[in-house]
Amino acid sequence: YAQVTFDGVPARDYSMANQPGRDHLEFHIRHVPGGATSEHVARSLKVGDEVSVRGPLGSSFLREQHTGPILAVAGGSGLAPIKSIVETALASGLRQPIHLYFGARTERDLYLVDHFSLLASTYDNLTFMPVLSEVSRSDHFRTGLVTDAIVSDVQDLNGWKAYMAGPPAMIDASGIMLRELGLRGEDIHADVFFTP
């Protein structure tokens, strides 16, 4: 992630959403009504405005030397760093199974579903599973907690690596669940922060 400063508002930490080494940085910034920084970005930021970026920071990045399965868990705009990790793994030619779970409250809270669905249909080692915590009128998405979906699908995570990003409560619950399924602490990677 990086610490991003916009003129006149508090600095915030945001995860990069694009692959490393690109000539630009991509950030996904959720608009939080009343949030000083996200309000500024949504209402006032213009092309050409100066932005200060400090980083990269944190420890949640793809470990390309890992050859076992990968579990990627995202909640809300936590999809940004997971997008970077998954796209980097695919672009690097990693062939192990990659299971991406994207938890959201409602269908309105989902984004990039078409993007990841296309990637999953292009790469046979990628599985993409959006999970809605509130019951949906659509039968296109699984419902329930993202942690319950993972437990239902995967009974043993021994030898896996997990990358998580999202709300702190989801990260905490996921970390407990991952350890219960046999994942070692050193194989769980997440940078936990909240940026209104």
Language-model features and meaning:
Residues 20, 63-66, 92-94, 156:
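Short, flexible hinge/linker loops that cap or flank conserved catalytic cores
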Residues 70-72, 163:
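Conserved beta-strand elements of the Class I
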Residues 55-67:
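A short, basic/flexible loop-to-alpha-helix module at the beginning of a structural domain
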Residues 81-91:
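Histidine-anchored nucleotide/phosphate-binding helix
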Residues 77-82, 170:
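Hydrophobic/small residue at the entry helix of a nucleotide-binding pocket
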Residues 97, 101-196:
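Reductase modules of NAD(P)H-dependent flavoproteins
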Residues 1-49, 104-106, 131-135:
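Ferredoxin-reductase
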